[in-house]
UniProtKB/Swiss-Prot annotation:
Membrane topology, Extracellular segments: 1-62, 116-128, 187-206, 265-286
The protein, known as: Atypical chemokine receptor 1
The encoding gene: ACKR1
Organismal lineage: Eukaryota, Metazoa, Chordata, Craniata, Vertebrata
Keyword Glycosyltransferase recorded: no
Top-level taxon of the source organism: Eukaryota
UniProt-listed CDD domains: 7tmA_ACKR1_DARC
Keywords, sorted A to Z: Disulfide bond, Endosome, G-protein coupled receptor, Glycoprotein, Membrane, Receptor, Transducer, Transmembrane, Transmembrane helix
Record InterPro entries: Duffy_chemokine_rcpt
Family from the record: Belongs to the G-protein coupled receptor 1 family. Atypical chemokine receptor subfamily.
Cytoplasmic side: 84-94, 153-165, 228-243, 308-335
GO molecular function: C-C chemokine binding; G protein-coupled receptor activity
Record GO cellular component, one term: recycling endosome
Annotated function: Atypical chemokine receptor that controls chemokine levels and localization via high-affinity chemokine binding that is uncoupled from classic ligand-driven signal transduction cascades, resulting instead in chemokine sequestration, degradation, or transcytosis. Also known as interceptor (internalizing receptor) or chemokine-scavenging receptor or chemokine decoy receptor. Has a promiscuous chemokine-binding profile, interacting with inflammatory chemokines of both the CXC and the CC subfamilies but not with homeostatic chemokines.
Length: 335
């Protein structure tokens, strides 16, 4: 296969066929008629398929494994801190929702090796579909949880609005599961690699998945920023609660944008005139995917930083929950 940089060479059979056609042409038209010269080499170069180098190929396996291990360790540490008895992170506003963010990050970290290239050709389509389901399901759930945490803020405290956290959790994870159905049905194993399937029969599923990613990863954070700015401009209150956790969308926003562009190109709704443009889009797809994968390491760090800042501010002014005062008195008497 050739590409825009290295054209495909003719095989011997193709060369013989071309020579035969040329001989027949010269034999049939041996008169004084003149015909325009045609640059067959230039036409061949233009017709050669455009080929892009995949950054996330077998050589990227160490990257997948390292990110998976670090993500599992970091998410597990954060979950331990959240559920550790009498630990001050439980005073963090909306900590049950934040703990679910760590769960989503851990789930993503676990399935990263399943979708990683270079682990052999033994993976089945069912395993790949499950991997994509958890991959995108955890990401969708984290984005929706962040949106609710930003919108409701301190109201998500477990003791302030009974049942709100549980109801939101079930609803948001359910919505995330529904949003993963298109990519789950439109993915499988090809040549031993887990990959989304692109075909006319699956075009509706591909379009639905692209729209879901665009809505959750791109439009949701833009909507939060817009609501924040609009409420502030109109003096209608503080608006969505802006904090360091919003940096999570930096890891998935490019993925949503580039995935939408790729779907438009595959559907021929957006035409790329040059091979270089197609190669640039493929490169952006790889970079956006790598950035999205890194979120499973960054999310626990963002959670730790947020809870550290929140508890440092709130701890002196908040009344201690039942059981904390006796625990602190015991520590004071021992000292």
């Amino acid at each position: 296969m050739g590409n825009c940089l290295h054209p495909a060479e003719l095989s011997p059979s193709t060369q013989n066929s071309s020579q035969l056609n040329s001989d027949l042409w010269n034999f049939s038209y041996d008169g004084n008629d003149s015909f325009p010269d045609v640059d067959y080499d230039a036409n061949l170069e233009a017709a050669a398929p455009c080929h892009s180098c995949n950054l996330l190929d077998d050589s990227a396996l160490p990257f997948f494994i390292l990110v998976s291990v670090l993500g599992i360790l970091a998410s597990g540490t954060v979950l331990f801190m959240f559920f550790r008895p009498l630990f001050h992170w439980q005073l963090c506003p909306g900590w049950p929702v934040l703990a679910q963010l760590a769960v989503g990050s851990a789930l993503f970290s676990i399935v990263v090796p399943i979708l990683a290239p270079g682990l052999g050709n033994t993976r089945s389509s069912a395993l790949c579909s499950l991997g994509y389901c958890v991959w995108y399901g955890s990401a969708f759930a984290q984005a929706l949880l962040l949106g609710c945490h930003a919108s409701l803020g301190p109201k998500l405290g477990a003791g302030q609005v009974p049942g709100l956290t549980l109801g939101l959790s079930v609803g948001l994870w359910g919505v995330a599961a529904l949003l993963t159905l298109p990519i789950t049905l439109a993915s499988g194993a090809s040549g031993g690699l887990c990959t989304p399937a692109y075909s006319m029969e699956l075009k509706a599923l591909q379009a639905t998945h692209a729209v879901a990613c665009l809505a959750v990863f791109v439009l949701l954070p833009l909507g939060l920023f817009g609501a924040k700015g609009l409420k502030k401009a109109l003096g209608m209150g503080p608006g969505p609660w802006m904090n360091i956790l919003w940096a999570w969308f930096i890891f998935w926003w490019p993925h949503g944008v580039v995935l939408g562009l790729d779907f438009l190109v595959r559907s021929k709704l957006l035409l790329l005139s040059t091979c270089l443009a197609q190669q640039a889009l493929d490169l952006l797809l790889n970079l956006a995917e790598a950035l999205a994968i890194l979120h499973c390491v960054a999310t626990p760090l963002l959670l730790a930083l947020f809870c550290h800042q929140a508890t440092r501010t709130l701890l002196p002014s908040l009344p201690l929950p039942e059981g904390w005062s006796s625990h602190l008195d015991t520590l004071g008497s021992e000292s």
